[in-house]
């Protein structure tokens, strides 16, 4: 346990040759590591907060469970495979269908729970039997199609958000592209982080950021928990979602 959070400095910690990779047990200088970590947090926010907002779940509860699952994952594999376990976009369609049928979050939680159990069983099978069978059942062309379909399904929500503030969206996108093209080294790799910062500053200048929620929010709070309510009729909509994380990971 003592060496889980210990990393060796990769080279001089400042430069990386083209194609060079920083291994899981290595790190760059702390400033560069913090920058890359901050960008990963920005990338995490997309799924961790957008999915509950679109499905009606509580974002703080989602953040709590993703944090717990990530911590457990890192402890189990002893940080050999550093990763963040966020919410999956694959659940948006079945949860939306359940909500449309007025079955409630408790029923949707049951579908998520069953899907999670099945995915855990797939993980056990991969651990003991390997992953060759996944490559046979789901070749790259199938995996790519599944991931692409998820992106296409999110297009309507992206367009809705774009219409809310098209100027901010364009400024952010332009900043991301320009930083990636014009700058080399670490700054070019942090184009997402830089683009989001520029877009946020622009939104503040335009008066598009509402800070009232910060003043109204409690300093300390607890997530809103829901007990699953069994409804086997919704399982045909949820069970296929198992294929999504298998294809993504």
Where does each model-flagged region fall?
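Membrane-embedded alpha-helical modules
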Residues: 102-214
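Entry/N-cap segments of selected transmembrane alpha helices
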Residues: 37-40, 113, 164-180, 230, ...
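Hydrophobic residues within alpha-helical transmembrane segments
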Residues: 38, 68, 88, 114-117, ...
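Transmembrane alpha-helix interface/packing and boundary motifs in multi-pass membrane proteins
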Residues: 71-83, 180-184, 242-245
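Membrane-embedded hairpin module used as a gating/binding unit in multi-pass transport
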Residues: 44, 199, 203-249
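Short, non-helical or kinked segments that cap or interrupt transmembrane helices
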Residues: 57-64, 79-92, 133-143, 188-194
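N-terminal signal-anchor module of multipass membrane proteins
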Residues: 2-82, 90-102
